[in-house]
Regions:
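Terminal-region recognition feature
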Residues: 1-212
């Protein structure tokens, strides 16, 4: 990944401990110990292998009670992240399960897409963790060869693909900043240059509930 070397450098940075923040509605300090032993632990690229691992661990979770999902990733396939997020949404809506997100060390790119599936009141980060949010990228070569009408159709198809990807991206951006102090336009402005956010800053901006 283009940002891999920068990521390694960031991991070595040691930040000053931040003061504890108040706990939001539905969560109390006595429930924080749940985060020390996540039911689901995911680490590595967000891909089909992670999704298979995610499903296996999710199926093995207790049938009742809160579920904690810990994630460490430098990114991956955003569509896999959206699929995992949809599984969380369905479990929450149909079974009424409380599912908490715990980001550890790095929650980059597709990892932030997955985090967006959780409301702010259910998002946590460990100390010194970084979020990284950026725009989707595309690499595509269009070959114009054939009757003019077919060439126009090929160009339009490529344009529609880009426009649809932007719509999906903006849906994710809105979900990430919902109920936070970050404005959608601010995120959209910072995303093209890869926005790195330290855990304490993410908490202060209301992007996560707390840092543990």
């Amino acid at each position: 990944m283009a940002f891999y070397e920068q990521s390694v450098a960031i991991f070595r940075t040691v930040a000053e401990p931040a003061p504890a923040s108040p706990v939001g509605a539905g969560m109390t300090a006595t429930r924080y110990p749940l985060l020390a032993n996540p039911h689901i632990r995911l680490s590595g690229p967000v891909d089909q292998l992670m999704y298979t691992n995610f499903r296996q661990q999710l199926d093995a979770c207790p049938e009742e009670g809160t579920i904690v999902i810990a994630l460490t990733t430098l990114g991956g396939d955003p569509e896999v992240a959206r699929t995992m997020a949809d599984d969380i949404r369905l479990l929450d809506e149909h079974d009424g399960r409380e599912i908490l997100f715990l980001g550890k060390v790095a929650v980059y790119s597709a990892g932030a897409t997955f985090m967006a599936a959780f409301p702010v009141g259910r998002r946590f980060l460990t100390r010194h963790t970084r979020l990284m949010i950026h725009e989707r990228k595309i690499s595509k070569t269009i070959t114009l060869d054939g009757p003019l009408r077919m060439v126009v159709a090929s160009i339009k198809a490529a344009l529609h693909e880009v426009e649809h990807s932007i719509e999906i991206e903006e849906e994710g951006f809105r979900a990430i900043v919902k109920d936070s102090q970050v404005d959608f336009e601010e995120l959209r402005e910072k995303a093209p240059s890869n926005w790195y956010i330290e855990a304490e800053q993410a908490r202060d901006l209301g992007l996560v509930l707390d840092v543990i």
